[in-house]
Amino acid sequence: RDVAPSRGLGDVYKRQRKGRVKMKAFLILEDGNVFTGTSIGSTREVISEIVFNTSMTGYLEVLTDPSYAGQAVVMTYPLIGNYGITPDMESERPWPDGYIVRELSRMPSNFRCEGTIQDFLEKNDIPGVAGIDTRALTKILREKGTMNGMITTNENYNLDEIIPKLKAYTTGNVVDKVTCTEKKVLKGQGKRVALMDFGAKNNIAKSLNERGCEVTI
């Protein structure tokens, strides 16, 4: 049966009911392991370093954390997106190259919700995979170490061609992408703190400032 949407989420629910045709997506690791799931977000192909995050909440903070630039993030918690997109961002934009989840909630419920993860990923051209065993994937990464991988919707992928590309891939200098381009100052009456921005989250400066510090970024 249909569940009545929370107030203010009518448009979100209408979009989700329309949905889109489910498309297969594949996560190919450089060790030859292949995980098959459903495409979420953008359908473009991407090669990236694969890392995992064990947070039970705060998926939006993870998506907007500059320290994940140049990486595709695996969320180990099984259900992601149940409260939608809220204003709780750690920067002005999302940074991961890809997003990998066990199950993506397409009907969020939260009075602060401004959209869905699916919409957010599509808008920011971030490809992802849902419906795979993220804990099995995390176990591989934990035992073998961080490795490169490819997210693709191409069902005719060729492992013999892809694996050498994955092994040769490097993330490059991501600091240039995430650092601020000009000095910022958060006024305070206490100690003066210099925050070097090599991908600093908004909450670091905010927390220092809330404790009375004048923060120069």
Predicted regions and their residues:
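RNA-binding accessory domains that recognize and position tRNA/RNA substrates
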Residues: 22-217
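Single conserved hydrophobic/aromatic residue that forms the stacking wall/gate
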Residues: 1-16
